[in-house]
């Protein structure tokens, strides 16, 4: 009788363990699948490029329109060459963009450049010699200063502003994806 009870208990434990392991694996698969779907970019069927993506304005005068055509009203005229914008959608030769203040509209694709620029979104941030909080500062950058993005690694991005190069905290700038 004692051996039978132990076998029954052992059999129940094995059955429970198998079920628990299957449920655990299914949940792990669902969580990983959801995480990869949320972080993945959509690939545009028009250009083959990811959406959303960052680009910059080619010229000093670029119209932001309500829709993807010259027939639509101009809502805003940008007058800042290299201003970074994020392409969120595409329609023919038009790109729906959002700027760092959240304004959205349509810009003709030839007025955009694939060159990557950033804009300072904090009131002030320090341009540093090296990537690190203990590094010496080279300059204080004010809000809306535009710089050329060279690369990002971890918390820091290496940028160029006129003839200065240095590191700035990624969270203080706009024009980079969260994944960088």
Predicted stretch roles:
Residues 1-16:
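N-terminal secretory signal peptides that target proteins for export/translocation
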Residues 73-75:
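Non-catalytic, beta-strand-enriched accessory regions in extracellular/secretory proteins
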Residues 37-66, 77-81, 88-129, 137-145, ...:
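SH3-family beta-barrel domains
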Residues 23-33:
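Bacterial N-terminal signal peptides
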Residues 69:
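Second-shell loop/turn segments in exported
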